[in-house]
Amino acid sequence: MNRIVECVPNFSEGRDLQKIDRIVAPFRGKQGVKLLDYSNDEDHNRLVVTVVGEPEPLRDAVLEAIGVAVQLIDLNKHQGQHPRMGAVDVVPFIPIKNVTMEEAIALSKEVGVEVAKRYNLPVFLYEKSASAPHRENLAAVRKGEFEGMAEKIKLPEWQPDFGPAERHPTAGTVAVGARMPLVAYNINLNTPSLEIAHDIAKKIRFIGGGLRYCKAMGVELKDRGITQVSINMTDYTRTALYRAFELVRVEARRYGVSIVGSEIIGLVPMAALIDTASYYLGLENFSMEQVLEARM
């Protein structure tokens, strides 16, 4: 592939494996499209797909998968720990190779127009594609979630960019946009207290006076009897993963709580992990050029 765009659509289904297979199917066996990864989480009740491709075939595959999700997912019956406003909650496009951010923005708008036309879904443009500053932050767009969107979408400042000014009865709304790569990073705590996880998340996220390029929220993992600080690192080159890990450790200690593990959701740039490994190993003057796989 000469021109490569990455797309990481998030779907509000993390439990029904048959539905998950049907949603992922449009990304398989398509020329010009490569499915890199998909992961589902039962507690979050969410599916995250990572796919790359040439802009045009990638666009077509994404639109097909959105159609499947709209058909299969009824948010009136959806319960999960992750905030959501749509069956297809968010569809970000990330320029990877020989594609500019401006071209990724244009692609996101093209997809947004088509989603509204085909599936009668209200579409909000966010991040680099946002039509207004207050729509750049996904959390602001999604505030109120599926249930609250019925009234929110009627407000003049929250009219959708494309599609009807009315929440879809079962599929809700969708955010589509272009952005830089982010790392979805979750840190697990040995406490069942969601209040503690929320408090720690508030302390580490930028909006609460914490780390720049860090978004965080507390999540309950009921099956395991623990909680989690769920983090999006929106620019790992400016704020490293280990900084988030260490700040969570410090804040957790105030509550007598420990970290029991962490996880990466989806794919992660090698540089993000090398940076963290260098920090904990105390490596001096280490560079990507010393990584065997990077030289092959």
Predicted regions: what is each one?
Residues 1-296:
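Long, contiguous binding/interaction regions
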